[in-house]
């Protein structure tokens, strides 16, 4: 068929007929930048969360939480999502150019629902609120979901083919809360936030680090298009593949720890092992399960050489 890389990617994540397994290093995306979404430095976002970068070349972390007590929710003002999308004429021109070049346009939002709630409240405060103040927790999460829904609407209006966001739900061993809490508090709000994106048949790229194998079936059931990064040391990737085949694509799964400290032979063997599990039937984008600038170049080179060698369908 001689598909373009972007067309091949779409065939793969839709469980169609890709010519090869897509790879994370392919130049097929244009990233649409929205203003005041996230900065690498010390800053205060539109929610009133103060971010501090404790070490150079790392991500800042929420240090001041504007709503530590959820019983004060009535006094807390949710920001206007449209404020992220002012003065976008230059970005519109870039989107038009990217689409003319055959690229897919991706637009991302940092700190989606769970992450946004705990950034606003503080992690411990929010987890306690889920148990002690469930009604107020539902109200807060619905407010955040409606904010996100409007953000996604704006992204689509600007021409986004894919929406992405960070929503780390897992620790190394399990979810940060019970699966029951996930289904009660979070899954209904995902449905609200994704409504327009699903109607527009655009791609939902869901990012969650940690162990998420207990909820991947639910993410697939609400039509999440793709899940990343599938941390291999936190999840049973065979189990996840069985659950998501023909339902939800997977991206990542190549052990980042091994990429950092392993030999090229170990990297090749691990990449081949993961490809053997995740490639069959489509729906897999081969990439590291975390992004680090310190990866030895020879290991990254081996990863993608192996992916090319073993990637044909």
Predicted feature residues:
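Active-site loop segments of alpha/beta catalytic cores
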Residues: 1-24, 28, 78-313
């Amino acid at each position: 068929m001689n598909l373009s890389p972007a067309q091949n990617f779409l065939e793969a994540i839709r469980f169609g007929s890709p010519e090869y397994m897509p790879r994370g290093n392919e130049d097929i995306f244009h990233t649409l930048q929205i203003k005041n979404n996230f900065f690498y430095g010390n800053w205060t976002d539109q929610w009133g969360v103060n971010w501090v970068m404790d070490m150079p070349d790392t991500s800042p972390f929420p240090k001041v939480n504007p709503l530590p007590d959820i019983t004060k929710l009535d006094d807390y003002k949710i920001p206007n999502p449209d404020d992220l999308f002012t003065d976008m004429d230059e970005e519109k021109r870039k989107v038009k150019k990217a689409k003319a070049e055959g690229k897919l346009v991706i637009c991302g939002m940092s700190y989606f629902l769970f992450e946004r709630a705990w950034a606003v409240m503080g992690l411990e405060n929010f987890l306690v609120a889920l148990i002690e103040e469930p009604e107020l927790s539902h109200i807060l999460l619905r407010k955040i979901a409606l904010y996100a829904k409007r953000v996604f609407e704006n992204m689509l209006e600007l021409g986004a083919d894919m929406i992405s966001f960070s929503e780390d739900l897992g620790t190394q061993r399990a979810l940060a809360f019970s699966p029951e809490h996930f289904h009660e508090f979070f899954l209904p709000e995902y449905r609200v936030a994704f409504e327009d994106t699903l109607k527009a048949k655009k791609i939902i790229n869901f990012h969650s680090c940690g162990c998420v194998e207990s909820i991947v079936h639910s993410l697939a059931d609400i039509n999440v298009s793709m899940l990343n990064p599938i941390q291999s040391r936190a999840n049973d990737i065979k189990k996840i593949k069985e659950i998501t085949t023909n339902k939800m694509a997977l991206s990542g799964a190549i052990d980042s720890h091994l990429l950092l400290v392993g030999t090229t032979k170990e990297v090749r063997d691990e990449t081949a092992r993961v490809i053997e599990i995740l490639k069959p039937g489509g729906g897999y984008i081969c990439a590291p399960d975390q992004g680090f600038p310190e990866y030895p170049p020879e290991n990254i080179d081996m990863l993608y050489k192996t992916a090319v060698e073993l990637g044909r369908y």
